[in-house]
Structure formats: structure tokens, C-alpha cells
Amino acid sequence: MTSTVSGTETSLRSLRDRPFELLKELEKRSRAVTVGNAPQTSAGREWVGVAFRMGGETFLVAREETREVLGYPAVVTRIPGAKGWVKGLANVRGQLLPMLDLRQFLGSGATASGRNTRVVVVNHREIPAGLMVDEVLGFRRFAEAEFNAEAPPTVIRCDSYLAGAFRRGGEVWPVLSLKSLVESQSFLQAAS
């Protein structure tokens, strides 16, 4: 048993610098342990998203719209003539990725870079983008029956990019559509 625990710790440690892969591995292991113990939802189907904090608010993005989650890169090269919310380009495993401050793009001030700051990489075929957020909270699962197409009001002005919300108990989780965001004219006009 000790060797199994040691092997598990080692493989998880190897994912320490790749937060999204770490979350996926933890999810996989959790599912393996709870297979057969998990209650079926009345709706039968579930929605999985990545939860993150921006300002003082929490949001969700669909797992399918998220390629990965990164720590904020140590080196980001500024792009002359770009708007303030365009932080620059980062070399991520040999690929150039535009780094963008999501909160600043939405007009709610700049995101302070700290140890919890993360970059949510958008899973879009034509528009590569890394969106800087205050913190990623991990995966959240909801029954489809918990979804409401009416988005709640938010302090951060992002209404045109909200695709509804999930409600559970007293909590409301607005769903931000990354596809709508990156395909919007405001987003595509990054030059100042």
C-alpha cells in the first residue's frame, strides 16, 4: 500500500506546474473511486464547467470551451499599439499565446498578478487566447435541471457574454460564454 501511495504522490507532483492536467487527473481518480456510489440525478445528464473568480465574483466556463489552465507566465512580451487589456504574448510550449486581462477587457479594472492568478486558455480553433483571472476554483458539476437561461446581474459588466446560470441552494453561478467573448467585435479589435 505504501508503494501505491508513493507512486500516486509522485505522479500528482509531476502535474504540479500544469494545473488543468492536475484537475483532470484528480477528477478521473475521484470518478474511479465513486463509480457505483454516485447518486443519479433526476435529469440524468450533467454539465461540467471550470469555476473561477474575477473581482469578488465567481463565474463558470464550459469545460469544452477551455483548453487548459496555466499559471501566469513569468515572461510576457508587450505588444506595441495594443489596448491596455492585452498584456502581451507568452511562449507556451513553443506556441505564442496572447495574454489578455479579462477583467480589464470588461471595464472593471486590471487584475493584480499574484500567486493565485491563473490563465484560462480558450479552446477555439481560430482565436488563440489566454484569459487572466484572479483564481481558478476547479471543476464544478451541475445537473442540467439546475440551469436557468436567465443570467443574473453581475457587478462586472459582462451581460452580453453570459449564457445563463446554474443555481444550487443559495448559490448562483453565472456561465460566461468564451466563444461569444472571443468572437465579439470588441475582443477582435485589440489595437488601440
Describe the residue ranges of each PLM region:
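An acidic, low-aromatic, low-complexity terminal/linker signal
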Residues: 1-192
